Amino acid sequence: MDFRNSFKSHSSYKQIRSPGDQSEPSPEHLPILHDHHPDHSGMVVDDQKPDSTRSSLDDGRNAPVERDASYKFWQDNTTGTSTDHTAVRTSDKDPIAISRKGDRLSGSFDFVHGKLPVDESPTKMVAGEPVNRQWRGRNNEEITLDVDQENDDVSHQTMPTPTSTARTSFDASREMRVSFNVRRAGGAFVAGSVPSSSSHSSSSSSATMRTNQDQPQLQEEEVVRCTSNMSFQRKSELISRVKTRSRLQDPPREEETPYSGWRSGQLKSGLLADIDEEDDPLAEEDVPDEYKRGKLDAITLLQWLSLVAIIAALACSLSIQSWKKVRVWNLHLWKWEVFLLVLICGRLVSGWGIRIVVFFIERNFLLRKRVLYFVYGVRRAVQNCLWLGLVLLAWHFLFDKKVQRETRSRFLPYVTKILVCFLLSTILWLIKTLVVKVLASSFHVSTYFDRIQEALFNQYVIETLSGPPMIEMSRIEEEEERAQDEIFKMQNAGANLPPDLCAAAFPPGKSGRVMNPKLSPIIPKSTTDNGISMEHLHRMNHKNISAWNMKRLMKIVRNVSLTTLDEQMLESTYEDESTRQIRSEKEAKAAARKIFKNVEQRGAKYIYLEDLMRFLREDEAMKTMGLFEGAPENKRISKSALKNWLVNAFRERRALALTLNDTKTAVNKLHHMINIVTAIVIVVIWLVLLEIASSKVLLFVSSQVVLLAFIFGNTVKTVFESIIFLFIVHPYDVGDRCEIDSVQLVVEEMNILTTVFLRYDNLKIMYPNSLLWQKSINNYYRSPDMGDAIEFCVHITTPLEKISVIKQRISNYIDNKPEYWYPQAKIIVKDLEDLHIVRLAIWPCHRINHQDMAERWTRRAVLVEEVIKILLELDIQHRFYPLDINVRTMPTVVSSRVPPGWSQNQPA
């Protein structure tokens, strides 16, 4: 509790006053923490429930609130009470007591109170409504307290202390008032609601009581609560914390809800969730249905109608004699019709050519995997190139120099140049689009495919293990079907079977041949499902994965969270995505407990391979066993190993999603930059071909280019180096722990020009990529299992036998922890120091790298504790090396207290 507010003077006009006592000293002269009034009345507040308050005012409205110098604090319930109770003594007669029950805080603060009977009849609190509470004083006065405040303050703030006094300044616009409406017995009065609370902080507010003399019959008293700026500062601090929160940390939870009721819409036996995005609907393995289906829009319909009309007109022009003689600008009519046909319907015809090329590409497996994506990606640009090429050819061969001589127009050459400019612009844009798509696809495949494949397999394992045992149910179903077939054969052969056997083989309500499709272990991909089966995912590699499938996998990782499956929710038709998503490490731990209870046998402390095979196929179960620490060596999975794996899987999935998002943003920005450069090149081409740029203009432009190169040359160089560093070198991803200049940093965000890191104390450090280009970067995440070093010293007089025993016992301990350390750790006598210290070194190798630095130090600390234990058991202690002291002369002893036998003149 903050007592600084209690020591402030009360210069406000709102003070504690009694209507009948005008000679009461001002609060400025009241002693602090002292018994001022020997006989006075007080108020009793007893909070027996989180939302209830009891108070009693002695002598009605003439009861001032006072404080005393006796304060007691404690953390535990050691005072003989069952509730958190702390006391503050205000006076001997009229004390004030506050008791808190069920408070979440470890400590408490109360006011010690005396004996004052309290009568109360509180009304029930209703959310969103004012709370009316009534108390009776000594003179049978009835006091009504109306409380109405924000609901969010009720659950997070503490009980107000009546010792708080008014601050030096008040904000009248934001003050909160609590009205005490007093009536005598026999009267009736209904108090109006006022904004206050039964539970709010007193450290940031102060309260005073004043008398409202406008209504003498009601004699209403008010407690005015003035909120200080500290509450607003705290809110702003919370907002700033949210803004500066790391993306690698769990988001804040506003409500603590139990993590239960997990469910998944469909167990796909590896069919991963589908992603519906408007720019890339993918319903087939390699080619989307959008490209397989023909579109018929308004423009296409007009092109078809124009094609039919122009072909009909062309046929009439070639067959009708009178039309053959018609000339326009000394050109036959059919030439104009051919030109209109190419100009209006050329794009439609070029689309037919693209479809023919795609048809032959689809017949070839390798071309379909590697080339088809890029063909569809640039199909519009290719279609425009073919169309403009046809238009240019038709214009060149139909409108020859004879037409120019006849028309004597200087505009026709410009038309030719404009068509050439359009064609070159389209070809240049086509090359740009193709290069960007090829580079982006190859970058994503080479960099993220392995991590995406591993993350999706982890998601499949989590969903499968949290659901019902599919494989076991399928096996039981097959056994039941075989038993039923045998019974059918025996019945057809005329054998008499006991009715119990038939009833057991054919239970009522079950045919034995139909299985719940939601529980089916293998579900084929339907035409409407965009999922990817695990069999298909396992067959993918860097060489055979298509660009479309890679794009699908990236969308799944970016947009789909880790989910669990609850067998009880399979039959539910109501889908709430938030109830089955793992969005924090806390939920990941809860999901691990749920999965362990679902997979383990009754009463077992570990999960074995046989338990996994109830949910997964044998090859998948073997692969899953290798994911948990210690499982390959011990052939079992512990609770801690399952929890650690699921938490690490959640962290990896979150970091991978952030990496893909940052990479997508960087690629889009790079694409925009290339678009700007391409547009500038196209403008220059137009100026040159149309001969708009004369020699003077070119000279002026070149001078400006030189000036811009001098100003922005270093910037262009920096941008180019940053792009090469990010997409070619690519030394890290989001979430990787790196070491730069001997400082360990975690990658927070990647951009084209900069990278944001988090230091060990969560300090954000921003490095320019051009500067990182020149530094050595150590990446812990991409490192293999890393070693460690532990050194300790013993005295030189330590026997070699003990040193051998130390080595043997440490080696045995490391070998007995195969889930943490590799066996046969190196233990050597490293050095001899000052002829009396022998330095020993232990060089073990972890089963992990140092990406999780906390886990690394935890395992190392356990090993150091074991070394200390071994040294203590072998009585290896620290000793000072004995020193030889040579005394050459000694002064004569002149003393009456000389031991017998000593001579005063004995030489030294």
UniProtKB/Swiss-Prot annotation:
Cited InterPro entries: LSM_dom_sf, MscS-like_plants/fungi, MscS_beta-dom_sf, MscS_channel_2nd
Q: Mind telling me which residue stretches traverse the membrane in this protein?
A: 298-318, 341-361, 381-401, 411-431, 673-693, 709-729
Q: What happens when the gene is disrupted?
A: No visible morphological defects in the coat or cell wall of desiccated pollen grains, but strongly decreased viability during rehydration.
Mark out the compositionally biased spans (Low complexity): 196-206
- Activity regulation (UniProt): Not regulated by MgCl(2), ruthenium red or tetramethylammonium-Cl.
- GO biological process, alphabetically ordered: monoatomic ion transmembrane transport
Q: Where is the composition biased (Basic and acidic residues)?
A: 31-70, 247-256
Q: Name one GO cellular component term.
A: endomembrane system
Q: Where in the cell is it found?
A: Cell membrane; Endomembrane system
Q: Which domain of life is it from?
A: Eukaryota
* UniProt keyword list: Cell membrane, Ion channel, Ion transport, Membrane, Transmembrane, Transmembrane helix, Transport
Q: How does it sit in the membrane?
A: Multi-pass membrane protein
Renumbered residue ranges of the record's region Disordered: 1-88, 148-172, 190-221, 242-265
Q: Please tell me in which tissues this protein is expressed.
A: Expressed in tricellular and mature pollen, and in germinating tube. Not detected in leaves or roots.
Q: What segments bear the compositional bias annotation Polar residues?
A: 1-25, 75-85, 156-171, 207-218
UniProt xrefs under Pfam families = MS_channel_2nd (PF00924)
Q: What does this protein do?
A: Mechanosensitive channel that opens in response to stretch forces in the membrane lipid bilayer. Exhibits a 6.3-fold preference for chloride over sodium. Regulates osmotic forces during pollen hydration and germination.
Q: Which family does it belong to?
A: Belongs to the MscS (TC 1.A.23) family.
Write down what this protein is called: Mechanosensitive ion channel protein 8
Q: Which organism is it from?
A: Arabidopsis thaliana
Q: Per UniProt, what is the name of the gene that codes for the protein in this document? A: MSL8
